Amino acid sequence: DQYFKLSEKGTSIQTEILAGLITFFSSSYILFVHPVMLSEAGVPQVLSLLATIFIAIVASLTMGLYANTPLVMAPGLGMTAYFAYTLVGGLGFTWQESLGITIVSSLIFVLLTFTGVIESFRLSIPLELKKAITIGIGLFLVRIGLENAGFLLEDGFNWSWIGFIGLLIVLVLTLFKVKGAFLIAIALITAIFWIFTDGLEVSSTNALLELSNYFDLLDIQFSNMIYINGLIAIFSFVMLLIFQALGIVEAFVEDREEAKKSYQVVSVMSVLSGVFGTSPAITLS
């Protein structure tokens, strides 16, 4: 309590444990969606999955222990979409070159953060725009959730009714002010899914073999970023990193010292993400 100031912040160990469980299960979708998105850019799924798990653990622990803020971190889907569909799919970079762009962009973000430029940038943005950025990120996550629940499929059979039941359970439990409404809903929907389906298919991929060749598979490249397309990609990536960080940190962190440390963690973990073969880690909530 002396370090984390739980009493001062109006919370308790029990509340934090429950909140941690809810946050974990509500964010775990990233373990399934993120590798699939990166695989469309050519990144081996086992590689991106291992990188996602490692970065999520290290980044979230650093955010809590160093910045003392209750923000979970993992590779963000917005950054992943830019990586897979713009850098690779649109501009024609290989995924190895895109990792190089990720690292360089993140290093620039680190420089802006530790020199105080990001703070000046924050002060220049109107409060309404900060709120709009946060809302936009939230709506993007809602869209992803609806897609994964099957609500946005145009045709074909899907399990959208399970997602609808889950949403209904959350609404009812929240209405009656039941603690852990999200956690209860997630547990119930998971049970229903396993009862009415055969569960998840087990991949036959030799993960240990791919793990032993991890850094050989990465083969990060920096050569093509000195050309105009590379410079444009780096500039765009830096802007995305800044606005993603601003949108979440400004919404959830009021203390300026904690916010400053949060930006530092986000910037450093973005670099680490690229080094280990995934798109930048961002604050999810």
Please state what every model-predicted region is.
Residues A59-V72, V172-K177, S236-F237, V268-T278:
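Transmembrane alpha-helix interface/packing and boundary motifs in multi-pass membrane proteins
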Residues S27, M79-L87, K130-R143, A187-E201, ...:
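Small-residue-rich segments of transmembrane alpha-helices in multi-pass membrane proteins
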Residues D1-N68, T86-V88:
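N-terminal signal-anchor module of multipass membrane proteins
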Residues K9, L38-F54, F235-S285:
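Membrane-embedded helical hairpins/re-entrant loop segments and their flanking transmembrane helices
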Residues I22-S26, W159-L167, K179-A185, L211-V249:
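Hydrophobic, membrane-embedded alpha-helices of multi-pass small-molecule transporters
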Residues L91-F196:
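Membrane-embedded alpha-helical modules
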Residues M63-I101:
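Membrane-interface helix-loop-helix modules in multi-pass membrane proteins
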Residues L47, A67-M79, I125-L129, V178, ...:
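Short, non-helical or kinked segments that cap or interrupt transmembrane helices
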